[in-house]
Amino acid sequence: MTNFVHKTVNGLKSLLDEKGAIQLFCSEGDIMEFLVTFSPDKATLNDIQSFEAKHQLSLPEDYQKFITLHNGAKIFEILSDGENIGGGLQLFSLEEIEEELKYEDLFEGINGIPIGYLLEECHLMIDKDKINQGDPNYLYIFESGLEYNPLNLNFEIFLDRYILANGEPFWDWRYYTAENYYRTR
């Protein structure tokens, strides 16, 4: 498998201004400004191996590549009149994943590792069962602590598409047809 996560990250970084901001063309003609920050910290091989041993799993190769580049990131936080008002995708560092896992009640019955947070109410999850089965489609969205839905993607394809879609929930687009699109607005 070819890893291109570094190309996706570097491509996005090349478009940012000196403050880490970017203007994007969004849905229905809106132009919005977003902030993108990548952690300067990098996970070491030792960090990854310790995490894997503790949680009895092997982190996917594409995800490992990302955290060895940047152990965490915030992508497409909304800037309103220059002020960061949140939103976007937060990719957790290994330490932040450990903090998230302390909320056992939230993840009860879910055999996954939360690697990020998005849409103000969803966790991006690596499904441990899929990893153990060698299934490359291991990413799930855990919505509001209720629904655990497969994305049928790996990390680098998710990240690439998320950036291509300017932070829009591209995985829901198939549900919006010409018949129902306008009823949701």
UniProtKB/Swiss-Prot annotation:
Pfam family, one: SMI1_KNR4
InterPro entries in the cross-refs: Knr4/Smi1-like_dom, Knr4/Smi1-like_sf
Signal peptide: none
SUPFAM superfamilies tied to this protein: SMI1/KNR4-like
Superkingdom: Bacteria
Name listed for the protein in its UniProt record: SPbeta prophage-derived uncharacterized protein YokH
Organism: Bacillus subtilis (strain 168)
The gene coding this protein: yokH
